[in-house]
Structure formats: structure tokens, C-alpha cells
Amino acid sequence: MATLFTDEELAAIRAAVAKAERRTRGEIVPMVVPVSARYRDASYLAGLILALVTLAVLVSLDSGWSQWRWTAHHSAWMIVGVLMAYALGSFIGRFPAMIRLLTSDERMAMKVRLRAERAFYEHGLHKTTEGTGILIFLSLLERRAQILADQAIDARVPPGTWDTLVRDLVDGIRADRRTDAFCDVIARCGDLLAMHFPPRDGENPNELPDELIRGT
């Protein structure tokens, strides 16, 4: 997480936010987190699957399986083997690839949405003077993004606008264009804000920080 963006890339994202906000009274906050939830159920499920597979293999053995010719019918050894398999599976189930494999798309989408909503309030996007805050939220493990806009700007953009921006951001991240993708989406959010909330009488206070927020 700490090395995902270099200092130069962080500076580029900060500059993109500052440039976009110079044309509007709105506020744009980019944020990235390593994961949006703990997904303990994926670890439990991986352990259960490996334990059941191990149990099936042990039960099916009809010949000795150690140098002392213990058989799978010796329950004590069978229990030890199953427990070890469960522990190993639970450990493997903590890896990002396994979490993605064992967790439904719907569940991951819900978790990312909830984490983004929490961040929206934690970082004060709901407190802008005119209700013009936009959160650009990226969750790395799930490879998903969310764009949440406060009510004033959200009411003025066509349906599907945020979904399009989210799709373009995720596509850019997957194509290893993370900085360019972030900066492009920031600029396009700036265009939307500038269209509906341009600076007024030279007043354009910067209500929220421009830096990329790196969550945990």
C-alpha cells in the first residue's frame, strides 16, 4: 500500500485536484484503501473446503499411510489431519486471490460501498458549504471503485455519470495506469463541478485537503 503510489505520483494527483478545484466551488477528494472489509468468512470457507477434501481422501484410503502402517480408520490421526488441513486452508483463505475467489461479487460490491460511505462522512465531504463534495474511492483488493457525490452536485448530473467514471477508473487501474486514471477522473469530476458550480465573485475557498487519502 505504501509503495503503490510514488511521491511523484502523489504530487501529480494532488496537482490534478488543485487544478480541477480552481474552476469550481466544489471539492474533490481521492482516496485509496488496501481492502474494504476483513472477509473472515473467506478464510473459514477455505479451511472448511480443505478439511472436507482431506477427510474424503483419508476415508478413501484402504492402505497404510505412514511408516507404521496406520490406516485412515484410525480416528485420532484422521482428526489431526483434518484439523491441520483446516488450519492450512484458513491461512490460504487470507490471501487476496483466494478472498476474491471465495467471495461473491455482490458481497464485495456491498462492502466497498459501505466503506466508501463511511469515508465520505469521516472526511467531511458532507460538510461542504454548498453540498458539492465528491469522493473518488478505490479499494485495491476488490479491484472496485465508488464515486459518491453530495446532494447538490449529484442532483445535477445525468444518471449513469458516476458509473461511467468508476468503470474508467477501474479499467485504468487494471491496465497499470493508476495515476493517469485517477487524474483523468479527477479532471472530469472537475468539469462537472465547474459546469454547475463555477467560482463566484473570485471566492473559491479550499474546504478540504487536495492530497490522496491513503486509508487502512
What are these regions (language model features)?
Residues 104-123:
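Membrane-cytosol interface motif
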Residues 40-52:
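Select subsegments of transmembrane alpha-helices in polytopic membrane proteins
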